[in-house]
Amino acid sequence: MKLQEKNPDVFKNDQSRRLSNEYLAKFCRDVPVESSESIRADSELLPHTDDVYRASGLNELAQTDPELAVQLALDLISRSKSGGAIEMAMDFLHQKNVNVGLGHENFSGGDAHRSLLRAQEIAAQMVSCDYSRLCGPDSLRAWVECVQPGVCQPGVSMQLIWQRSNSPQIYEAAVAIANQLRAMRRQP
């Protein structure tokens, strides 16, 4: 029996990886060095870079004041306009096993906690994508992240990756949690 007959996904992932490599090579070739340097310089002037700095220090802060670190992480999730800060804050809360109080109603049973954490992680990414242009069709983030689940194809987006690499229950819960986060963020 051939390897392809045993596991056809191996070859699907190879094709996905090849498509991703082709896209990334073209992307990197088409971006002038000056452009990426000016983007980096401009990003340092953006007001939300403080949030990224604060989010990157959550683990250090937790060593001296764990309650303040958790409060800061929750604040970043509910108020920051930095996608990176939102994702880092959610990751921190998960590392510390902090209950963020979103999505529990969507899961029960033995795998409930792990599924809930995954749905919350995806929800944070969805909200993060609201503040960047990195998640749409043919975006750099999508082409980088599509390799692992093997879904690289022209027009790939984070939405497609989330749908295809998670169970319908996790994906639907993530959408619901992301909507809860968005509603929470709209409140003054």
Language model features: what each stretch is:
Residues 1-101, 131-142:
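Short helix-capping/linker turns of helical repeat alpha-solenoids
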Residues 134-188:
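Terminal, low-structured helical/coil segments at or just beyond the last alpha-helical repeat
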Residues 87, 96, 118, 187-188:
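Exposed acidic/polar residues on beta-strands and adjacent loops within beta-sheet cores, strongest
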Residues 95-156:
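Mature extracytoplasmic/lumenal regions of exported proteins
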Residues 7-8, 65, 97, 128, ...:
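Short, flexible coil/linker elements and helix-boundary hinge sites characteristic
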